[in-house]
Amino acid sequence: MSETEVMKSNISNILEGLLQRKGIDAQKIVIFGSYARGVQREDSDIDIIIVSRDFRDKSIFERAELTIGIGRELVKKIKKPFDLLFYSDDEWNGSRSLIINEAKENGEVIFG
């Protein structure tokens, strides 16, 4: 297993644990962007989408409150910068967002 694959596995395991502790049931965790395409640089951040039914009917502020501290814990454990995005399953399945479409087309599902 490559170093990148090990890191993705670690990210998945860490996020699963952090989300469970927050009472969030993730349906899917997707890495997209440069890490998914294999063109990351040393200073690249890791782009991640977390999809959960628990984000349905929640504003961006409510989602931030639910997920507070997850990014900080992930950075502490992995030692890389992250960009975490949180979407409901309805948004993931029905959105025409460029970010969601990019993640669906070129991302890598690491959980779910």
Predicted regions, residues:
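Short beta-strand->loop micro-motif that forms the acidic, two-metal-ion catalytic signature
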Residues: D47-I50
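Glycine-rich beta-strand-to-loop/alpha-helix junction loops that act as flexible
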Residues: F32-S34
